[in-house]
Every structure is written in structure tokens, then in C-alpha cells.
Amino acid sequence: MKPEIIVVTAAYGAQKVAELGGQTALLPLIKQAGADGVEIRRELFNENELCLLYALGNALSQHQLSASYSVPEALWLDDGTLNPRLPQFLQEAEQIGAKRLKVALGHFVELDSSALLDVLQASTVTLVVENDQTPDSKLAPMLRFFHQACDAALPLDMTFDMGNWQWTGEDGLQAAAQLSRYVSYIHVKTAVPHGDTFRAIALDEADDSWRSLLNALPVDAPRGIEFPLEGADLLAVTRHYVDLLRAA
């Protein structure tokens, strides 16, 4: 069975998404490109769009696209406490009919499993915790969190961002070897040095190391396109990478 291919709307860039009329306006293009689903980004909404989540959910259903919902927030705040807005974000995810809600780990200190379990059990959406580009998402804290969450039988999984290990200065293959059993969603991304940091690039511009890393992760995990989708013909570009990842 081929893995589900998801297009992350942010791959088109915030400016292009706005020019095209917002994330809802991208759905026909993404469907025509052959994708199975869309990752909706909260940071790309304006205030009015945040009030129209049910309408977005209906549009996703009409286009027969699965939904994932990404929020630019951390599960754990800087003081180590659970993000009090998590129930709100899960509710927003439910309104668009999302299968999963993606957040970053944040500053994990100690697992308050009962509090987190109460929040998760109140929702039909699966929480998937991602390694972002900050020191809080280095391999050691990610492992510690998922080991404890697994021991506590918490109903959550990991979003494995293939490119973000470069920002944290770690080896993606080593991370995959230790974290793959927790992974249920993959952000496909590769990056190259750019000044004192990195920048994401399209797969056609990268070497083949991304294939080895992808093959080290669960074969049935949905694959999200989070590298830049750019060009004069966005439909052709999107279709090219949907086909590439489906065959990889």
C-alpha cells in the first residue's frame, strides 16, 4: 500500500498563499496534483478565516482531501508547563475535520501524564509532536519525552521532520533509528547551509541522502511535502513531487 501524500500549504510560501486567495483556494490545485491530503497552517489564517473553520472543513470534504492541522506553538511552555491552549487547538482541528494536530515539543521538563491524558481523551484528533529547529527539539529531550509518553500509554505520536535535525546539529539517520517507532507522520524536507543557518530546498536540488532517511522511517506513515513548491506552473510542480514521493 502506497503512503498517503500530503501537501503542506506553507510549501508555497505565505506571500503566494495570500496572493492565491488563502489556503481554501489551494485545495483544487492540490487535488488536481494527485495528493491525498493537505496540512493546514494556523499561521497562514487571517482573523476572518479563523472564524470559518467549518467552511474550510466542508471544502476539504468536497475535494476529498484528508486534513492535518499545524499550529506554531509548543506542547510545553518555556516554564515547562503544559500549553493551556492545547484544548482550543484540538477543537480547531476538529472543526476542519483534521486527523491530526501538529505542535512542537517545546521545553519539556517533566511529564504531567494525567493532565495531558485528560485533554487528549476529550478529542477525536491525534496529537503529533514534532522536532522543530530549536534546542528543545534535540534528540535527547525528544527521546525522553516519547519514552515517558509511551510508558504512560498516552495516545500521541511523533511528526518526524527530516530537515530540522540540520538546524539542531544532529544526524537525521541516528534520530530515525531511535525515534521511528513513535513516528506516524513525516515532514519531508532537506536543507543546505545558508549563512549561519540553513534553508530548505526542493528535492530536485538536493542529493539523494533524503531517500535513505525516508527509508529509515515507517513506510506507511503519511509523507508531507514541506520543502518549497515554486515555479510558473504550481500544478505541474506539485504533481511532480507528489508522484516522486509516492514512488520513493
Region locations from a protein language model:
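Histidine-acidic metal/acid-base catalytic patches
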Residues: 1-11, 15-34, 87, 97, ...
